[in-house]
Amino acid sequence: MAENWRSRIITEGIQRTPNRAMLRAVGFGDEDFNKPIVGVASAHSTITPCNMGIAALASRAEAGIRAAGGMPQLFGTITVSDGISMGTEGMKYSLVSRDVIADSIETVCNAQSMDGVLAIGGCDKNMPGAMIAMARMNIPAIFVYGGTIKPGHWQGQDLTVVSAFEAVGQFSAGKMDEATLHAIEHHACPGAGSCGGMFTANTMSSAFEAMGMSLMYSSTMTAEDAEKADSTELAGKVLVEAIRKNIRPRDIITRKSIENAISVIMAVGGSTNAVLHFLAIAHSAEVPLTIDDFETIRQRVPVLCDLKPSGKYVTADLHRAGGIPQVMKMLLNAGLLHGDCLTITGETIAERLRHVPDTPDPNQDVIRPFDQPLYATGHLAILKGNLASEGAVAKISGVKNPQITGPARVFDSEEDCLDAILAGKINPGDVIVIRYEGPVGGPGMREMLAPTSAIIGAGLGDSVGLITDGRFSGGTYGMVVGHVAPEAAVGGTIALVQEGDSITIDAHRRLLQLNVSEEELAARRAKWQPPAPRYTRGVLAKYAKLVSSSSLGAVTDRFV
């Protein structure tokens, strides 16, 4: 296959004289028209520390592509900052941005007949957005993570942005003074890079490394270290070789490689958002995957890494301890990883791991020995019951009380709930319900980091449950259950909950139950009316019309 297998349609022949004329204006010479044209999709932005270092990485990617004999073409895609928009109306655009990113990369690459694409992302939705596009297009592709932020430091503590969210709850509960709150604000985010714990961005980048779509060790590098830039240049070279070898995303993104990714997510204690995003990636790659598959994998894979939000360490510590390859090698040796899966380098997972030690360095405790795991089984549990017949997702690591039955405290928006928590109106034993925040109802399925952090900060993390048809940040922990489906806006049972109803959350039995008779629920359902759309124009209105259930990945192109 010719290296310029797609771009030749715009570079060859007399009829393409005008096309070549425009390409000459952006730097092409006579010798370049037979080279593969490789897109560099850059999510550089100064609205968030997650993405503010990506421009320099994009330049290194271009250099790598050129050195390997390709012609890079740089273009931009968007990002939003989940951390900055958290707790506001703006957070409704976060999950929407995943699909905008996917659509934008697909649009540019296909419009310009690119032979391959290297995407660089930082904030949470950059990763799944780029991978969805790659899986859809199935042209040679590689993902480069912009890198994790280094931890902040204050009074001997490692800080992350979640420290600041939790400090708000502590301050509101009278457990922290304003000077301490201000100090944490100043020290939590010391520079460039994505939020530092095993939150959503680091979870997804780690999963892509495990899946074979990113270079090994690249997902845990810090954004500001030289090795991140060097790895990015190498990724450009590897992609050009993948074009020559005709290695496509769907050769790599298979059922087995997705199982590998999910296994690593469980082992590192990753974000609940990974469930939503991998359902969407599998849909784009036409790989059969259901929400129940996560539960199957959870039951066989232990949590091996002691990482924030519920653990001790940050992702930079994981890198020093051996990174994702060390975790993968342990899973491979235990028969929990498919070693025959292809990677973007052309080697298999087993081949790439052949030089990785069988056991972690005994002089660190970020990665536990396989026979001494943090938890014997995975932490992302799929709960079902009359409140979530299609399923819901709970992160059960660090939960001291895995079962709670209590009175429902019902809120139809995140803001109303947060106000109640900060005003001291939530009591131990309560089960908070935040509804009409799902993919359709929000729309956009906001993350509930502000309420959950306020609960933790108020000292209620072990005594209060929270369920929602919205999402949770990767920084959330506690007795919280999200992605409840069907959601309230489409008539799910969560819409029928009334203040004071008894609700049971049982992580051991994987049960989410409204303790109300079927007769009473039928009577309530007969009276229920769907709410009017919150938006009738613009991207949120379009999204609400197109988006599927969270149990199907909240995708916007499921038409059959």
Curated annotation (Swiss-Prot):
Active site: residue positions: 473
Gene: ilvD
Catalytic activity: (2R)-2,3-dihydroxy-3-methylbutanoate = 3-methyl-2-oxobutanoate + H2O; (2R,3R)-2,3-dihydroxy-3-methylpentanoate = (S)-3-methyl-2-oxopentanoate + H2O
Name of the protein in question: Dihydroxy-acid dehydratase
Domain of life of the organism encoding this protein: Bacteria
Subunit structure as annotated in this protein's UniProt entry: Homodimer.
Positions of post-translational N6-carboxylysine modification: 125
E.C. no: 4.2.1.9
NCBIfam families: ilvD (TIGR00110), PRK00911.1 (NF002068)
GO terms classed as biological process: isoleucine biosynthetic process; L-valine biosynthetic process
UniProt record similarity statement: Belongs to the IlvD/Edd family.
Cofactors named for this entry: [2Fe-2S] cluster; Mg(2+)
Positions that bind Mg(2+): 82, 124-125, 447
Keywords: 2Fe-2S, Amino-acid biosynthesis, Branched-chain amino acid biosynthesis, Iron, Iron-sulfur, Lyase, Magnesium, Metal-binding
Function: Functions in the biosynthesis of branched-chain amino acids. Catalyzes the dehydration of (2R,3R)-2,3-dihydroxy-3-methylpentanoate (2,3-dihydroxy-3-methylvalerate) into 2-oxo-3-methylpentanoate (2-oxo-3-methylvalerate) and of (2R)-2,3-dihydroxy-3-methylbutanoate (2,3-dihydroxyisovalerate) into 2-oxo-3-methylbutanoate (2-oxoisovalerate), the penultimate precursor to L-isoleucine and L-valine, respectively.
SUPFAM superfamilies: IlvD/EDD N-terminal domain-like (SSF143975), LeuD/IlvD-like (SSF52016)
Binding positions ([2Fe-2S] cluster): 50, 123, 195
Top EC category: lyase
Listed GO MF terms: 2 iron, 2 sulfur cluster binding; dihydroxy-acid dehydratase activity; magnesium ion binding
